[in-house]
Amino acid sequence: MIDIKELKFDEKGLIPAIVQDYYTKQVLMLAYMNEESLKLTLEKGETYFFSRSRGKIWHKGETSGNTQKVKKIFYDCDEDALLIQVEAKGPACHTGNISCFYRSFDEETEDGIEILNKLYERIKGRKINPVEGSYTNYLFEKGIDKILKKVGEEATEVVIASKNDSKDEIVYEVSDLIYHLMVLLVEKNITLNDIYNELERRYKK
């Protein structure tokens, strides 16, 4: 393990820290650390950064609740940059996006994991801030029995589509099932990271 003193902080005593989702490997944000904030991160197990604009240390998620539990910290070959893998509790970006890097120079389609994360956050947002006429809010208003009924119905539709052997139909019905499963997860306050954790546990067996 490297001694913090061996890291190459810049002339202002800072080192760039790239934050990456431990499970999805999506890059979440870029921030800066000084020696003290890095020590706090190692000690507390959550990310602490140094704000260049405010000139002080800040704890990620202190006000928003979107904390980042540290899983691993890497440093590069030149010892002048950090890669921090985290288990994120909520979006990393102040805009509400999962990642601060949500804009692109081109129009390429987002990857599947990002779409799932955004869908989950959208459903969660509907529960917190209901929108009149929203089907998602209708499910939350009707409660757990209605949600479970829909999950069961959609699972049956997947079985039927699979028996019909139509790829388009299977994709459509599985998408419906995933959506309703996410509604169930939000209702039960279960995050996608909880699911990623379990899948990782099984993968390592």
UniProtKB/Swiss-Prot annotation:
List localization entries.
Cytoplasm
> Region entry Phosphoribosyl-AMP cyclohydrolase: which residue ranges?
1-115
Family to which the UniProt record says this protein belongs: In the N-terminal section; belongs to the PRA-CH family. In the C-terminal section; belongs to the PRA-PH family.
Recorded protein name is Histidine biosynthesis bifunctional protein HisIE
**DNA damage: present as a keyword of the record?**
no
* Catalytic EC class: hydrolase
Pathway participation: Amino-acid biosynthesis; L-histidine biosynthesis; L-histidine from 5-phospho-alpha-D-ribose 1-diphosphate: step 2/9; Amino-acid biosynthesis; L-histidine biosynthesis; L-histidine from 5-phospho-alpha-D-ribose 1-diphosphate: step 3/9
One GO biological process term: L-histidine biosynthetic process
Question: Lineage, please?
Answer: Bacteria, Bacillati, Bacillota, Clostridia, Thermoanaerobacterales
